[in-house]
From Swiss-Prot:
Keywords: NAD, Oxidoreductase, Tricarboxylic acid cycle. Belongs to the LDH/MDH superfamily. MDH type 3 family. The active site is at 178 (proton acceptor). The keyword Oxidoreductase applies. This is Malate dehydrogenase. Disulfide bonds: none annotated. Its EC number is 1.1.1.37. Pfam families: Ldh_1_C, Ldh_1_N. Substrate binds at residues 85, 91, 123, 154. CDD domains: LDH-like_MDH. GO terms for biological process: lactate metabolic process; tricarboxylic acid cycle.
Length: 314
């Protein structure tokens, strides 16, 4: 007997939503509901992707819709709805507009798919996860924000590029909010198992250059927004969300930095912020508390304060 395919709903059919739908189809992770308020956009993108299925050898169903009823009984939901950044805008500038959208999305998740695992991508990320959480009444382990995976990927790529080595050999991660106060942890970065701090001591790269990479990581999203001049990044954000989705659907129990709910971990309560988590079949199965030096702790708590302030503005 053939196992029933998972149902994955994508709320928002913009650049990230469309890219997600195609990536899910290529990996055959499940059937897709592509939902958007714009009539014709999700239907057109769904048809375009499914017309590529004979070439891609993908046997999943992709349905475009404008009706929230169609997300009923989803196994997983990825939210990308809302307006994107434009040059000169910060992620925080999106707050009021996107908060209203997230409230509506959360209420419909509560109504139609209260048992789904939910990944929020919409910016300003940490605040938007909180809005969806409150309006959906989801358990804290079943909702996360996609930020740390993306920020960590940028950090890893910039290091690999500067060192002229394979990205596969670079391990690094970023804590804190998805914004200017994020904390790329140099002390936990390594190259093929060799701590980055030792690579610096060897003279392969200078600490000054690493600090430049840290700053470039913090401004990674802005760099792309400025280059595109209309819209924001979507390939890397989509890939990041897929890694989280796949870890949940396949119970991979990968350690991934996500905006997760803290209930005392790191001395923080009742806040979603980027920390290392284990994602498996039960959603966020564990929050890992890593030790930080005084400087890193100071930066992390500065990030916590920035996220709290943003959440209070909403």
């Amino acid at each position: 007997m053939t196992a029933q395919r998972k149902k994955i709903s994508l709320i928002g059919a913009g650049n990230i939503g469309g890219t997600l739908a195609h990536m899910i189809a290529l990996r055959e992770l499940g059937d897709v509901i592509l939902l958007d308020v714009s009539d014709g956009i999700p239907q057109g993108k769904a048809l375009d992707i499914t017309e590529s299925s004979p070439i891609d050898r993908s046997n999943v169903n992709i349905t475009g819709t404008n009706r929230y009823e169609d997300i009923k009984n989803s196994d997983a939901i990825i939210i990308t709805a809302g307006i994107a950044r434009k040059p000169g805008m910060s992620r925080d500038d999106l707050l009021q507009t996107n908060a209203a959208v997230m409230k509506e999305v959360g209420e419909n998740i509560k109504k139609h798919s209260p048992n789904a695992f939910v990944i929020v991508v919409t910016n300003p990320l940490d605040a938007m996860v909180s809005v969806v959480y409150k309006s959906s009444s989801l358990p804290t382990n079943m909702i996360v924000g996609m930020a740390g995976v993306l920020d960590s990927a940028r950090f890893r790529y910039f290091l690999a590029s500067e060192l002229n080595i394979s990205v596969e050999d670079v391990s690094a991660f970023v804590l804190g909010g998805h914004g200017d106060t994020m904390v790329p942890l140099i002390n936990y970065a390594s190259i093929a198992g060799i701590p980055l701090t030792q690579i610096i001591e060897m003279g392969v790269i200078t600490r000054g250059k690493v600090d430049e990479i840290v700053e470039r990581t913090r401004n990674g999203g802005k760099e792309i927004v400025d280059l595109l001049k209309s819209g924001s990044a979507y390939y890397a954000p989509a890939s990041s969300a897929i890694s989280m989705l796949e870890s949940y659907l396949k119970d991979k129990r990968r350690i991934l930095p996500c905006a997760a709910y803290l209930n005392g971990e790191y001395g923080v309560k009742d806040l979603f912020i980027g920390v290392p988590t284990i994602i498996g079949k039960n959603g966020v199965e564990k929050v890992l508390e890593v030790k930080m030096n005084d400087s890193e702790q100071e930066m992390f708590y500065k990030s916590v304060s920035a996220v709290k302030e943003l959440c209070q503005l909403n």
